[in-house]
Amino acid sequence: MRLQLIGIGRTKAGAERELTARYLERAGQAGRAIGFPSVELREIEESRARRGDERKAQEGKAIRALLQPASLIVAFDEHGRSIDSEGFADCLGQARDSGKAMMHFLIGGADGLEPALTESAAFVFAFGKMTWPHQLVRIMAAEQIYRAMTILGHHPYHRA
């Protein structure tokens, strides 16, 4: 199963970009041996619309253009449910075993995701009850994908 992290906004050079790239590279390396041959990041330009609902609609359209048919969608949203790292790894393992070819992880922009995307997602997760900057959520999602690969591959990175 291929994994694709889709985020609104382009990460500028610096710590955020480096951390995201590092965790996704590690996830790709760890995932190949356990049925996840690739992990990639796709960045979508932020909408310049004035109103939040218009921005979400435009960004949602751009996200939908990247979604593969019959893929599994995971949305990261502040209103999603909290899950621990082992539960997240179980989710990825079950998805891999379902026979689907692609899993998309969606991160909205400053206004969040278009409601139609969260409604169509198989899973909607939150990183706790706090609100996080979408660039930081990208790093956290990349790290949790890597952590899930290490849990599924019985690597000592995760020590819970």
From Swiss-Prot:
Question: Which catalytic reaction applies to this protein?
Answer: pseudouridine(1915) in 23S rRNA + S-adenosyl-L-methionine = N(3)-methylpseudouridine(1915) in 23S rRNA + S-adenosyl-L-homocysteine + H(+)
- Identify the GO cellular component terms for this protein: cytoplasm
Localization per Swiss-Prot or TrEMBL: Cytoplasm
**Where does the record place a coiled coil?**
none
Domain of life of the native organism: Bacteria
Q: Cross-referenced CDD domains, in alphabetical order?
A: RlmH-like
- Database matches in Pfam families: SPOUT_MTase
UniProt KW keywords: Cytoplasm, Methyltransferase, rRNA processing, S-adenosyl-L-methionine, Transferase
Q: Where does S-adenosyl-L-methionine bind?
A: G108, F127, G128, K129, M130, T131, W132
Q: What does this protein do?
A: Specifically methylates the pseudouridine at position 1915 (m3Psi1915) in 23S rRNA.
Subunit structure of this chain's protein: Homodimer.
Q: Which NCBIfam families match?
A: PRK00103.2-3 (NF000989)
What this protein is called in its record is Ribosomal RNA large subunit methyltransferase H
